[in-house]
């Protein structure tokens, strides 16, 4: 393992975040800490994960898309952000693409994603 990958692995270990196994097509709920003045609260953002970047590394991020009041809204979350309180997988989607950017131009029934009923958790790297 090269030096940079080793440093990234150490940083990910130091964060010790419990990140569930999810991919593009899954419906996720992200609990994001929002600071308003002196108060901090957790705001849930629920939508379809349309992309993952840089895998599970320290620079990893994912994009979540939802329809809010008839308007499509996308938000990019850093995977190891300290502002992320929780990530919960609501529903597993069955898709054949890694990036679902085509959903941006679709509305209604054509934007639906079939549920993956045959999901198997992948084996951890340590096993």
From Swiss-Prot:
The keyword Ribonucleoprotein applies. It comes from the Bacteria. The keyword Endoplasmic reticulum does not apply. Keywords: Ribonucleoprotein, Ribosomal protein. Belongs to the bacterial ribosomal protein bL19 family. PANTHER family: LARGE RIBOSOMAL SUBUNIT PROTEIN BL19M, RIBOSOMAL PROTEIN L19. This is Large ribosomal subunit protein bL19. It comes from Jannaschia sp. (strain CCS1).
